[in-house]
Amino acid sequence: MFVDLAHETYPDKVWLGAHEERDFDLVNLGSSGGKWAFDYTGIDIKAMNWAQQPQTLLEDYNLLRHFHCILKPGGYVLITIMPFTGLNKNTGLMDAMKYAKFDVQGDPIQPYMFEEAQRYAAYPILFKKQALKALIRYLMGKDKSCDTERRPLLDHNPMDVNELERDAKRWISGWKKQFGIDDMDAALTEENRQGREYRIQLMRNLIDFCTEHGYKPVYVIPPVTEHLAKYYTPQFEERYIYGYLKDVGRDVMLLDYSKDDRFRLDDNLYFNSFFLNKRGRKLFTKRVLKDLGIH
């Protein structure tokens, strides 16, 4: 429920008091796609992976605003771009609870229901019915996915071809339900169009923050397996991914690996149809650093 209870992933006040490291070369932001795309362990670079599963763009922005002090001048901020980064998502109590244990000053990472989240974090017995239901759903998901939690640590794909095909269909079906999409090639619904406008401005704010503080923002589109990528039609990609970045209207380097067959066609670099496994993350991270010219 709470992220970074050991204060090792994010440089909050506890981390800063326990570590002397500063002048980091790079941080990456993002949701699940970023969390399972980058792994800097064993690489001669000072970098942090600030992505979480899940994590909104607003939370990305606020994490950067709170913790950017560890970056060196000219440091890179990798912004992971996923299929629906350009659409807004509803947040709830569990989103606010994720960051309730952070030791930060100023605005919270997730302002929505922040005071409630703080109260519940301190006094769980006060959980209301709504919060208790959310907690039960969360814990049930954790209980039934012990094997799933181990999968990202594998260096191979535990799924066979048929399982990968079914997994890809589940992702597509889930996204359609989450964002109210019937046809992925159709125009945006009014609700998604409004969410797009919000996300455009939010991304502009994030990019502008980077440039104003002397950092180098970079869009990164990680690869997915062919089992999932085949559902991303040119119309879909233009409308939901590239069109969104164009509408943001900022001059930002784009590293796009969605068509890189070295990753896309090798199922054994993933732990499902979507996310890179331990070996895949290592290879992908080295590739990104090489393309940035910093490793």
Question: What are the functions of these language-model segments?
Answer:
Residues 207-232:
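Active-site segments of SGNH/GDSL-like serine hydrolases
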Residues 94-209, 213:
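Secreted/periplasmic serine-hydrolase-like ester/acetyl group-modifying domain
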Residues 61-64, 196-204, 234-244:
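Well-ordered, non-membrane alpha-helical segments in soluble/globular domains
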Residues 23, 72-76, 214-216, 251:
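A general structural motif
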Residues 234, 239-295:
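C-terminal regions of proteins
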Residues 1-25, 70-72:
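N-terminal secretory targeting modules
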Residues 81-85, 223-226, 260:
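Short beta-alpha junction loops
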Residues 28, 33-120:
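Membrane-embedded segments
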